Amino acid sequence: IGLYLLSILTARDLGYIGTLEAVKRIGNTIGTMLRLEQWKGHYYNWYHTQTLEPLRPLYVSTVDNGNLIGYLITLSQGMEELFKRPLIGKENIAGLRDVLSLNSGEEDMEHQSLLNTLMDSETVSVSEWLMLLDDLKGQSKAVDQLITEYETEEELFFPWSRLLQKIPATLLSEKGVYQETSRKMSELLKQLNGPISLQNIYDNYLGILKSLSETMVSLNRDACQSSGFRESGKWLKDMEISLAGSYSAIRDFASRCHRLRSEIKDIIDKMD
């Protein structure tokens, strides 16, 4: 059980599954462990995989349970790290590259070259990541399955990410009435279009909203009579709504991870 739990973290580290899928699998396993019969907090060596009843002869190995404690401590620390690390990293690109290489029907030099280029870059922006996922769709069933996982967590945790692909040109213009608004917009994008973690959004939500609000104020003050005002205003309002959804989803996920880590600690503490 302990090795399986750590293999889930390893799969996430290698980019073969996403953060959401990793926590789901860990939660399912811990939930099953809590249902298993124990002896003074220790697990028996054998259980029926269907009924979960301990198999005879009943046997408790202090060595195996001791190893399990070590695995669970590592697991808990790894789960904390999942929340702090960027949701999109080079390991995700490496995982996609491996899956593409193993499942492509023919040598896919174009996509492999794109993946290698992103691997060599210093960071991967949210926009680059979304364009990559769109570009790789349809290559194979396995690739599409992994892309679906990544898109699911992107839509849950960063629902504003797709808005970054359709920013009104006027919000990025450095000329005329949009000059100050563009400067505020750049400050907002620096906080969103980079290697950001769930912890980053959770901790800096109010600061991000402040940057968004300043952009709105600048737009309303300086460009309310311009031709692109309505489109730009709608985009900013959509971003505000999406950020609220992002914060809510991340907060719920943080609570879920906290409960899981508490359950893991309880399992450890019960082993005398």
Locate the predicted segments by residue:
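Acidic, mature catalytic/reactive cores of soluble proteins
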Residues: 1-272
